Amino acid sequence: MEIQAFLNHIRSLRGYQDQIAHIEHLAPRRAVYGDLDAPLNDRLEDSLRAGGVWPLYAHQAEAINHIRAGRNVIIATSSASGKTLCYNVSVMQSLLDDPSTRALYLFPTKALAQDQLRKLHELFSPGLLPPQMMATFDGDTPRSERADVRRYGRIILTNPDMLHIGILPNYQSWAGLLRHLKSVSYTH
C-alpha cells in the first residue's frame, strides 16, 4: 500500500478521525559520506561492508575520528541516522587493537539493550568477536550467567539501575571491567 493511501485509510477510520495532528512530507536528501583519519582493521571494514553499513556517513566518520583521538563525543542526530554505529565501530576497533579493552553501554530499558545486543551479534559475531564477549547485564540476567558476563564480557550492555545496584556496589567483582574500561556510551 502506498503511504498516501495508508494515511487516507487511517484518517477514514472512525477511531482515528481528528487524531492525526500533522503530516509532513520531507524530500529525500543525498547521502554525504565521510573519511576516517586512520583506516579500520580490514576485518572490521569487511564486516561493515557485509552488514551494508559502509561507507560511513559524514557524521559517523567525524564522530569515529574524534572518539579514536580520545575525545569525548555527544552525537545528536535524527532517529535512525546511525548514531549507534559511531561508538560500535570505535569500540570494536579498540577491541581488535587491544583485546583487554572493555566498554559499557547504558540504555534506559532492558528491551533496548537486548535489541542492541542482537544488532551487535548480527554485525560483529562470530567473525570479529565471540558472542559471549557481548552481553547484557540486567535484572533478567540469570544469576548462573552473571559470573560469565563479568569474566568474558568485553562489551557490557546494561541500564543505570543495574550500574548503581549491581556493578558499582560490587566493584571488586567488576575489577576487570573497571580496570580496562575505555568507553562508556549512554543512549536515551
Labelled PLM ranges:
Residues 54-186:
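Conserved P-loop/Walker A NTP-binding site and adjacent catalytic elements of P-loop NTPases
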Residues 1-58:
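Helicase-associated low-complexity/disordered flanking segments
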